[in-house]
Amino acid sequence: VRGLLVVALSLCAAALLASGCGEAKQAAAASVAKPKPTCAYPAGWQKLANRIKAPVYCPGWLPDPLKGQIGGQWNNINSVSADRSYLESFVWQETGGGAAGGELHVNLRAYPGRTKIPTCRTGGSDSRNVPCYADPGRLISANGITTRLYTVNQDADAWHALLLWRRDGTLYTLSEHVAPPLTFDHVVRYLKQELGSLVLIKPAV
């Protein structure tokens, strides 16, 4: 009987040890940090940050085939204004015979030293001043950044879903065109993935 008791106690101890090891492994796995986003084309974004003397956000991911390379194949607008605000636009359009006419269009903007939403002109015979970004909706967060979703936007961001946030006295936006083959909900999912991929690049000078 005593021998059986010793065996039973040994088995219980082994089971408890195994359980503890399993829990330790689970805790260790849970504590492993997610990999940080990576800027695939840092040179152009560093040059932009140096030029405007303010931090910029480099996209680590854009929907295929877009690449977040300033001066690259898909970068159709690379514009910096006198007030240091900038627009970086990346676009792909399906063209040619039999094409369905799909489009992917992503804009990134910043307004250094300004947090107020800028004013735009509506254009046309009844042109008037309106906020460039309007009809704010829900909050969307990723990558430590909390943004507000805007759905009525002007100029290059017209017909785009747009994320807006502020950091250290600067207003930033990230927007994407709602156009085939993407639905509004699909665009919002893409925007959250793009937001999660952003890498902050500070000026070196």
What are these regions (language model features)?
Residues 22-24:
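Bacterial signal peptide processing site
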Residues 168-205:
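Surface-exposed amphipathic alpha-helical segments
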Residues 1-8:
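Bacterial N-terminal signal peptides that target proteins for export
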Residues 35-168:
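Short, solvent-exposed recognition patches
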Residues 26-31:
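Extracytoplasmic/lumenal low-complexity Ser/Thr/Pro-rich segments of cell-envelope proteins
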Residues 17-20:
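C-terminal motif of bacterial Sec signal peptides marking the signal peptidase cleavage site
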